């Protein structure tokens, strides 16, 4: 799509109103060329629980309704494929607000500096202390339960994780 940057906000507004009906929200909107056609990809997540497993029927229904709504959208005059999909179970946590929403979730976090001899931690994000502006994560290291406090500014990378 040649004009994707100029129409992305309008597509987002249309998609947001439709996705709310299915208790979904936009995680990310992408445009890329694949299988010899333009693809408009809308990655979604649950509104209330960002890492909740999504209902396949909701994704299909929202895709169909969004496809109908975009059919008459003047900015999409060239052929394209619409793909509404889950953002994934191990999706990146991209902001402090998203990390706050991840409290009580199992996450993987990489810190700029080591804490308790490790800069990479996988565990349950227990809490966000508003007064201290710090997060607390609990994890196991060599069979012992540990807790670490960190600030968002110390985070190099974070994502949801699957506990095995």
From Swiss-Prot:
NCBIfam families: PRK14643.1
Provenance organism: Mesoplasma florum (strain ATCC 33453 / NBRC 100688 / NCTC 11704 / L1)
Subcellular location field: Cytoplasm
InterPro entries per UniProt: Ribosome_maturation_RimP, RimP_C, RimP_C_sf, RimP_N, RimP_N_sf
Function: Required for maturation of 30S ribosomal subunits.
Keyword Cytoplasm among record annotations: yes
Keyword flag Amino-acid biosynthesis: no
Family: Belongs to the RimP family.
An annotated GO cellular component: cytosol
Designated name of the protein: Ribosome maturation factor RimP
Domain of life: Bacteria
GO annotation, biological process: ribosomal small subunit assembly; translation
Spans through the membrane: none
Coiled coil segments of this chain: none
Keywords of the record: Cytoplasm, Ribosome biogenesis
């Amino acid at each position: 799509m040649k004009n994707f940057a100029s129409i992305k906000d309008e597509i987002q507004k249309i998609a947001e109103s439709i996705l709310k009906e299915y208790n979904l929200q936009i995680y990310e909107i992408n445009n890329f060329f694949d299988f010899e056609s333009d693809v408009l990809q809308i990655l979604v997540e649950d509104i209330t629980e960002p890492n909740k497993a999504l209902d396949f029927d909701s994704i299909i229904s929202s895709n169909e309704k969004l496809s109908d709504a975009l059919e008459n959208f003047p900015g999409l005059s060239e052929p394209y494929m619409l793909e509404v999909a889950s953002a994934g179970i191990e999706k990146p946590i991209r902001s402090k607000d998203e990390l706050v929403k991840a409290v009580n979730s199992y996450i993987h976090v990489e810190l700029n500096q080591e804490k308790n001899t490790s800069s990479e931690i996988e565990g349950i994000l227990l809490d966000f202390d508003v007064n201290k502006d710090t997060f607390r994560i609990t994890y196991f290291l060599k069979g012992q339960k540990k807790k670490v406090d960190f600030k968002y500014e110390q985070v190099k990378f974070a994502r949801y994780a699957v506990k095995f």
